[in-house]
Each structure stands twice: as C-alpha cells, then as structure tokens.
Regions:
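Bacterial signal peptide processing site
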Residues: 24-27
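Bacterial N-terminal signal peptides that target proteins for export
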Residues: 1-9
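C-terminal motif of bacterial Sec signal peptides marking the signal peptidase cleavage site
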Residues: 18-22
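A eukaryotic "domain-start" boundary segment
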Residues: 29-31
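Hydrophobic alpha-helical targeting segments used for export or membrane insertion
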Residues: 9-17
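Mature extracytoplasmic or organellar-lumen-exposed domains after removal of signal/transit peptides
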Residues: 33-448
Length: 448
C-alpha cells in the first residue's frame, strides 16, 4: 500500500525519451555511461538576497543536501553489511556479529530516511522513490511468493542482484525497500539470531522459506536501496553530489530508464535544489512566498499530518473500536503500523518530527535549542509572527511526547490503543495546526 501524500503543487512532467544509453555498440563493446550534466544549485548566500531566498538557500544547503548525502552513504554501508552477511551464510561462516552489523547499518540508514520525510516533495515523490523503498504494511503473501520462487531467488543470488531487482520488481514491488529488509533482520523488537537464519523461517505462513534465501533477498534489496538513495542525492544536488554517489549511478545506468527527464526537475534542465531556488511560472514556484509554503505545507505538514492521522491514527482507531474507511474504500486495519518487526515505530515517528525541526531550524542538529541565522524560525521572528511561540512549543511537545512513548517499555505494535498513542496523536495534530497557521500567515507577507 502506498502512503497517502498531499502536495502544494504538481511538478511539470511528461513523457520523454531519455537522451543517453548504456547499451552495447555495433562491435559489442559496452559504451561508457555518462551521468546527465545539469550543474548544481547556487546556494551561496549574498547580502543582496531577499530574506526568504536566504532561508531557502540555507535549507537546501544545510538540511536537504546533507540529509540525502548521509542517507546515501549509510545505504552503501547497509549494502556492504548485507552482502557480507549473505556471503558468510553461504560459506557457512555466519556469526551473530554479521547479523548485528547489518541491523545497525539498517537502523542508521532508516534514521536518515525518516529524517528526510519533511521534504518528500521533489524527486522522492515525482519519481515515486518514496513508495519504491518505503511502502507498508508489508504484504506477507507477496513476500512469501518472492522468497519461494526459484526464478526470483536465482536472480537475488545472481551476479548483479541490484539490476535484477530494478528490472523485475513488479513481481514483488510491495516488499521492496526498508520493510522487506526489516522482516529479514528483526523479529519481536530484536535482531534475528544466527540459529534462526540458518534454518527455515518460523513466522506463521512462512515456514517454507529458507533463511539463506531471506539473506539473498536482503542483499539484493539493499543493493537496490543503495541505488535509489544515490538517485535521491544526485537528482537534488546535481554535479555537487558526492563522487561515491556518482560512481554508484555510473555503474547502474538502468535506474534512469524508467524515469521521465532522467529523474530531474523542470523537464530535465536542473536539479531539484536549483528548482526550489528558482521561483517562477516555469518551475511552478511563482514566488518566494510560494516556496515558503511548499516547505511548510508540501513538506513539513505533509509528514506531520500523516504521522498523526495514518501512522499513529489508523491502528489506534481500530484498536479503540473507531475504525473508519480508507480512501480506497477499505476498512482501516490494525496492521497499518510502520516498523512492527523491529518495534521502532515511535523512533520512526520521532525522526519524522525531527525532520520538521531540522527544516524549521535550518540545521541537522536535532538537539539544537537556537535556530540557525537564516532559518524558517529566525525569519518568522524577524517578521514578528505572533504565533512563533505556539509553533515552537508545539514542535517541542510533539518531540517530547514521542520520547515518552518511545521510553515507555511498550512498542506501538504491542499496545496500539494505549493512552500514550492518543497523547502522541494529539501533540502531533497540534503541531500540524501550528504549521498551517504559520504557512497561511507567511504566504500573505512581502518577500523581504
């Protein structure tokens, strides 16, 4: 199931034949793949810049870029740890330390992804990279089919599992990404054991699945996540992306083949960083106020409302006898819980709110008590926004309420109807209200 998203604007996209090839030439020699040349964003702050422009430059340079770079770097580590784990299992030398290393790498990668969810607009949404690596709840039936298909298992164990996943994922699309990997690595809030992964799975309905095949799936999906997170970094940063990310994509040209405009913004003419910094009728951001509104509503409130209403709200409503109906006309489900196997739901949701804090404070320091000079919060203060304290208090309260739930000793999946869950819903909903108030106010101000 793809997560429900709302966006302030629709980017201008259309069908286009990609202007590069990684196919062999007439002599059977593979051509060198060249990444699209689209330059990089101009993020240097000048004294002549409008204040809203300074805020956006700081946001792009010091929040969005380093988050995607950390995500891509951690995904490379996750792939390496997953590959090492699979090869050790295949050789009969797997130890618990191999599993623990992969679990730790997973958690580090997951953290950066969750802390990017306040800016899912842009490449993650336009290129459908968000649902590609983060759809939930996990479809256990589809996962079982994938893990018992000899054809798919052979592909996961093949010479290029990342390419195999990229070209064949329609057969197991709903179990790609973080939640398929989570199922392999964690159960009941704990790392899987070496003994468990040396045998068949014991989960209900999965007893025909071999541990070695789960690990083959893990390293194949981790390879795909490595590519997708590199794509996120590159499409936002352009030529400013790290050499490691450029290397990953240069060796995986196939990830571009299903993307319109090479996955880039403004009909393939610029990276998403520059796109956000170019308010005009052409890019779709008609003014700096519109850019501010996109960050507040299309970014921060989009994830804030989802945490309250869906990530926390759906299972809570079912658990307390108030189940509703989804937009698809289906009954809400008690299983609509993110990260149930690792018991890290509250951690995920707090990281989502940290993503909002980082966006507003203009820094990736989640413990920051003072916003950066050119930040949303500093701009609101400079412009004498009367609701600034209410917004700040709502943000801090949402973080603290989730911290209390996280440290309660009970995970969300264990007690989805607990009062602590309602407390979190109320706190995050209040933050959503304050974000909307601030966005409405700033949209009416002059772009000083």
């Amino acid at each position: 199931m793809k997560k429900i998203q709302k966006f302030v604007m629709a980017f201008l996209l259309g069908a286009m034949t990609l202007g590069f090839s990684a196919c062999s030439d007439d002599n059977g020699v593979e051509e060198k793949f060249e990444l699209p040349e689209i330059g990089q964003a101009t993020t240097k702050i000048n004294s002549s810049d409008k204040d809203m422009e300074k805020v956006t430059k700081n946001y792009v340079q010091n929040v969005v870029y380093p988050t995607y770079q950390a995500l891509a770097a951690n995904a490379r580590t996750l792939y390496s740890a997953s590959q090492t784990l699979y090869k050790a299992a295949e050789a009969g030398t797997m130890t618990q330390s191999h599993i623990d290393a992969a679990c730790e790498a997973f958690k580090n990668t997951r953290r950066e992804w969750e802390r990017s969810e306040a800016f899912l607009f842009g490449s993650a949404s336009d290129n459908e990279l968000d649902p590609h690596i983060d759809s939930w709840p996990l479809d256990r039936k589809e996962l079982k089919n994938a893990l018992t298909s000899q054809t798919l298992i052979a592909g996961f164990k093949g010479d290029d599992p990342a390419k195999f996943v990229s070209e064949n994922n329609t057969k197991f699309q709903s179990v790609l990404g973080f939640h398929g990997m989570e199922f392999v690595l964690f159960r009941n809030g704990k790392n899987r054991t070496a003994e468990a992964l040396k045998a068949n799975d014991t989960e209900e309905g999965m007893t025909s699945v071999k541990g070695i095949d789960e690990l083959a799936f893990l390293q194949a999906v981790a390879a795909d996540v490595k590519n997708i997170t590199a794509l996120l970094e590159f499409t936002w940063m352009g030529s400013a992306a790290s050499n490691e990310t450029k290397s990953v994509l240069s060796n995986a040209s196939y990830v571009f083949t299903s993307l319109r405009y090479n996955g880039l913004a403004a009909n393939g003419t610029m990276c998403y960083g520059q796109h956000l910094l170019s308010p005009s009728a052409t890019t779709g951001y008609h003014s700096w106020q519109g850019t501010m509104n996109q960050i507040f509503i299309g970014g921060c409130d989009n994830i804030c409302a989802e945490v309250a209403d869906q990530k926390l709200g759906q299972a809570y409503r079912v658990a307390t006898g108030n189940a509703g109906v989804t937009e698809d006309g289906e009954r809400e489900s008690i299983d609509y819980i993110e990260s149930p196997y690792s018991h890290r739901s509250f951690i995920d949701y707090q990281d989502n709110i940290y993503s909002i804090k980082n966006s507003l404070y203009g820094t990736r320091d989640v413990n920051a008590t003072t916003p950066a000079e050119n930040s949303m919060m500093s701009l609101l203060k400079k412009m004498n926004y009367s609701g600034l304290n209410d917004l700040s208090n709502a943000l801090n309260n949402a973080i603290q309420t989730l911290e209390t739930a996280k440290n309660s000793g009970k995970s969300f999946v264990e007690e989805p109807g607990a009062q602590r869950v309602k407390d979190c819903i109320d706190a995050v909903s209040n933050l959503s209200e304050e974000l909307n108030k601030a966005a409405t106010w700033i949209n009416l101000q002059d772009a000083i």
